[in-house]
Amino acid sequence: MIRGIGVDVVDVARFARSAERTPGLVPRLFAPAERSLPARSLAARFAAKEALIKALGGPGGISWQDMEVVRDEHGDPSFRVAGVVAQVAAARGVTRIHLSMSHDAGLATAFVVTEGDAP
């Protein structure tokens, strides 16, 4: 059963400029394993994290560090969640998080669907 959906779009060049202007931005938004990726990949991961927050209903108190985009053995993206994000997901009955990301023509997009068992 679908529990939530979220989508986000990020302008890659604008994100890159923000990251250059604000040295603490990348460490605040991304887990250590994500930080060395190129701007287009970071922008897509930021869009993914924004989309996940929307899919979870936009709760406050979430740490960006509690959401990490990882790749499985086939290269497919997924989330590793912890802390408040994991607690909110569990409280909302979320048992699966589906993620799709793309970047093209200067834009990064992400779409998230959260699922859970029927009540």
UniProtKB/Swiss-Prot annotation:
A GO MF label: magnesium ion binding
Gene Ontology terms: biological process: fatty acid biosynthetic process
Main location per the UniProt record: cytoplasm
Cell compartments where the protein resides: Cytoplasm
Catalytic activity, as annotated: apo-[ACP] + CoA = holo-[ACP] + adenosine 3',5'-bisphosphate + H(+)
UniProt-annotated binding residues for Mg(2+): 8, 50
Keyword Cytoplasm in annotation: yes
EC primary class: transferase
Keyword Cell membrane appears in the UniProt entry: no
UniProtKB keywords: Cytoplasm, Fatty acid biosynthesis, Fatty acid metabolism, Lipid biosynthesis, Lipid metabolism, Magnesium, Metal-binding, Transferase
Cofactors demanded by this protein: Mg(2+)
EC number: 2.7.8.7
A cellular-component GO term for this protein: cytoplasm
Function: Transfers the 4'-phosphopantetheine moiety from coenzyme A to a Ser of acyl-carrier-protein.
Family the entry assigns: Belongs to the P-Pant transferase superfamily. AcpS family.
Protein name in UniProt: Holo-[acyl-carrier-protein] synthase
Annotated organism of origin: Clavibacter michiganensis subsp. michiganensis (strain NCPPB 382)
